[in-house]
């Protein structure tokens, strides 16, 4: 048949490679008869050869091959059973046909010839009753029938125009009257016909009939068959009309890469018009892309040459494979030498990444920087054949490239092996998580990058450069390495500097340090980092940091480094750090007098407090991380950016903490180290288990990281510590910002070991306390880390306070390694604070035994702000770094209008610091406490003693006020001191509670005992139920109460309790007491249990009740007004409440301040004075075990 007689009908319906597909074609009948249109899905009679029997063909595909200009078709042939080799059997139905197993590809002209035989003799098939055209014309049934036909018979293609063409041509009787069904369809059809046999034919067009298997045929003499079997036709292969060689190459699912090569060609102007075969084109594109890759080897030129010259696929493939092999060898070798070996190639889109393809595609698009700038990583992903539906394809591809290939790309380009680009935190809450994830993803690579960066920084630091230069360089390095987490840091550091005043440089130094630390922590496995960091740290102290701060920083950093080094089993870094610290100490100017420090620190703290409002929110969002970060650094960073810097390890946090906490009084809400990085307030079950096991272990023996039992504390040391605490109480105390130490062998362990013996030594040197050094340094280190961190986070400390706190801290640490981890282990930051508070309380209590409680109480009353800060510091004395961190976090959080961690009570110190003017002159807070500054100093000393007192007085969970016994002690300074000594002895007899004491309001808030009303408080005070509370600042309150035994006195006490009392309250739980008798059975609790009333509930009880611990749920998220209302419930307290409000809010009476003053005072309120037990019970259901 002439080509002119054949033509396509309708527009193409698709294309694939060289094929263009159509839905129908028209051919001219023989003899000049009417044209006929055959469309996809049509059944028609054909005769393959003149001598062969007629059969039915089903037209399944029509296409034109552009390269050869062939018009082709694919059809399935159906023969009657008798026309098959097996013949008809009894099993064959009368309407059955058998299909040829293979489709036949036939040129259109041949197919047209096949269809023009005489088929009048064909009599088989079921003669269905056609639907009358008049019936179909009613109610749009024709259109419905057409739609049915299109959707069912034509694979959803639109055949409207084709049908119109057919209608215009008109149909013969023999046209479109064949239909072959599947056997199930046929059965349904016959069944439906039986059901509607008495109905008119129009019912066949009913939608229900059609849905149930009815078939509406409009042709005049429809013949319906069914097919359920196939056979192999013996002679079709011999038919010259059948040309299977033209069959379209469509087997299998089209590869996802196929469209990519085309796009790449268009992008690179390599459009190949001669794509004879898709596979060939793809191969060419691949090779070209690979050749474009700037590879150290010159093989790609061969590959490129081959593709350009149309070499055979085999040759091209071999060359490409050779190039790929050479590339992979070079890549693996380089990455191994770089200490970031490629161990497992990840998957993208359910397909393992082909590093060679990825590298070539990236190079073709211009390399990493260009692709990132142009946001073309999705192109790389498509090149790799990823899942097209992936929404994170670009990010995942880029991160994999950064970790697996980017270092090598930079190497071959001669670029510097810079740290991997930081990951941008998605949200503030998840920033820490994401940062960790990022570091994990690129951990191996980053380790080396960071190590190199650390080395560079080390060199810079070692050079005699200005502090600013060193810090700036370090900042640059670390910013580049951790832009994601620390972009905010530089600003934070800068903001800090003005705020800090005397130690402005420290923040910068600290800032770089934290960055390094983050890297280190991220790659804590490498001891190199610790070594490298040591020089940096040493350089930092050499910066113009105040001597005190330097000392603290040195000690803390040393400890941190030590911890990391210990974990790495590399002591050299520790030695270096110690040396660096000692050198820095030696180089540093003599420590400033304590008198000077208190003034400066309060001012700084005040300034920070002012800043804090912003910080609080961020801290609240990322409680866990905040604690770890340098208090000031975090504080400033948070202020500047809601995004919280993500720090992988606590080591980093501690480093930051050291400089920040040393320089800043502001306290961050402490977050337990054990909390999962992702969820600041949530402790993972594993962590909790570890905590509990560690707690039990700690309680059992002095060797436990939590701290040696009080009996291990020598009375001499305790006495000296008491003296120290008293002397410290005389001036503000700035606990060393020591990292929190934790038994956990992971990051937490590093943190625990952070506190270096050197730091203790520096503290001892500073204070000339040999006693402290005598204590087991390691235990002390651990407890010191915890306590100092806690103290730091809880209360802003003045430099003097820092020194004093350091001494007390050392002693306390030496005496008892109260584990701050317990706080860390708390399920929620609130619990954590409680724990820290109690732990700190224990330590303070031990000292307080020696220090007159009157002094403590007085100091508390004198200046809640100073006292609290200092008290916190005192509490922190044992773990200054920990306390500083926590204190700063709490102070900052409280000073910030928004709490650092809502679950953590805001440190009253912060509140007080905020409210009062800068400096110890926070007399408004002090007045709030109801005592003069001198009292504050005394109080601080007392606080120290209280903190030091190992004996924790039992305070009913709600009693905010100190237990009667303790209050009496507090009331009577002489008695207090005696009782303190007694308590100390008891503490010695008891195992140090694993909970860390916390003086800060956070601790108070952490203390759950808020349930009892003020009257109950009085009763509690009178009763010995409150015994569990260590005589922290409560003594002050107690003394006040003693002075004012009436309800008003109680109210004032409760008010003070909000500040100081609350701190005590948080410390209420005896530090020495086991976490809870119920929680910890056996020897762990034995010593403590003796002293705890049966109903006593330990702060760690929260661990049992995680609903209370939920980080999302503040321990008691009561507005200050609520708290005040509670106070107002008792008339006597109302005055105190208002007085408290007046004093607490003077500096900033913003809602945030109120929240801080009262929510965190809730801790104070916790003092049970404010809240009736019923009210608090719902919030803290597990108050009692």
Curated annotation (Swiss-Prot):
InterPro entries (UniProt xref): ARID/SWI1_ChromRemod, ARID5B_ARID/BRIGHT_DNA-bd, ARID_dom, ARID_dom_sf, BAH_sf
CDD domains to which the protein is assigned, alphabetical: ARID_ARID5B (cd16885)
A GO cellular component entry from the record: nucleus
Domain ARID positions: 321-413
Keywords carried by this UniProt record: Activator, DNA-binding, Nucleus, Transcription, Transcription regulation
Bias type Basic residues, positions: 252-261
Origin superkingdom: Eukaryota
Compartments where found: Nucleus
Molecular function GO terms recorded: transcription cis-regulatory region binding; transcription coactivator activity
One GO-annotated biological process of the protein: adipose tissue development
Annotated segments matching region Disordered: 248-281, 413-550, 713-742, 883-932, 1033-1058
Spans traversing the lipid bilayer: none
Biased segments, Basic and acidic residues type: 447-461, 473-487, 1034-1053
Main location: nucleus
Biased composition (Polar residues): 462-471
Domain text: The ARID domain mediates the interaction with DNA.
Function field: Transcription coactivator that binds to the 5'-AATA[CT]-3' core sequence and plays a key role in adipogenesis and liver development. Required for adipogenesis: regulates triglyceride metabolism in adipocytes by regulating expression of adipogenic genes.
Family designation: Belongs to the ARID5B family.
Name assigned to this protein: AT-rich interactive domain-containing protein 5B
UniProt organism field: Gallus gallus
